[in-house]
UniProtKB/Swiss-Prot annotation:
Assembly: Immunoglobulins are composed of two identical heavy chains and two identical light chains; disulfide-linked.
GO terms for cellular component: extracellular region; immunoglobulin complex; plasma membrane
Coiled coil ranges: none
Official protein name in the record: Immunoglobulin heavy variable 2-70
Function description: V region of the variable domain of immunoglobulin heavy chains that participates in the antigen recognition. Immunoglobulins, also known as antibodies, are membrane-bound or secreted glycoproteins produced by B lymphocytes. In the recognition phase of humoral immunity, the membrane-bound immunoglobulins serve as receptors which, upon binding of a specific antigen, trigger the clonal expansion and differentiation of B lymphocytes into immunoglobulins-secreting plasma cells.
Organism: Homo sapiens (Human)
């Protein structure tokens, strides 16, 4: 009976609920001061062409809180952190399921772990 109930429950769940969303960040581990950092977020399990979908970049300096950097949405609208907007560019390639963040004029204070996230 338990197996039957589980099977029936699975059959009533929309297929999109069962899809697995993954995001993977890639880029250099280190950049020198004044260089440009380019990070790529490759994702699966959703489409950035779908209305309401967004991808953000955030970072976390060692021992500090998360800091939001930038967001791009399905309609190619772009939003940036006020304090960093002159140094950041976010773009997307929906054919490759990728969002790219570039950050110019890197400085030691930019030392952090950088993450992308679906919003």
């Amino acid at each position: 009976m338990d197996i039957l109930c589980s099977t029936l429950l699975l059959l009533t769940v929309p297929s999109w609920v069962l899809s697995q969303v993954t995001l993977r960040e890639s880029g250099p581990a280190l950049v020198k001061p004044t260089q440009t950092l380019t990070l790529t977020c490759t994702f699966s399990g959703f489409s950035l062409s779908t209305s309401g979908m967004c991808v953000s970049w955030i970072r976390q300096p060692p021992g500090k809180a998360l800091e939001w950097l930038a967001l791009i949405d399905w309609d190619d609208d772009k939003y940036y952190s006020t304090s960093l907007k002159t140094r950041l560019t976010i773009s997307k390639d929906t054919s490759k399921n990728q969002v790219v963040l570039t950050m110019t004029n890197m400085d030691p204070v930019d030392t952090a772990t950088y993450y992308c996230a679906r919003i």
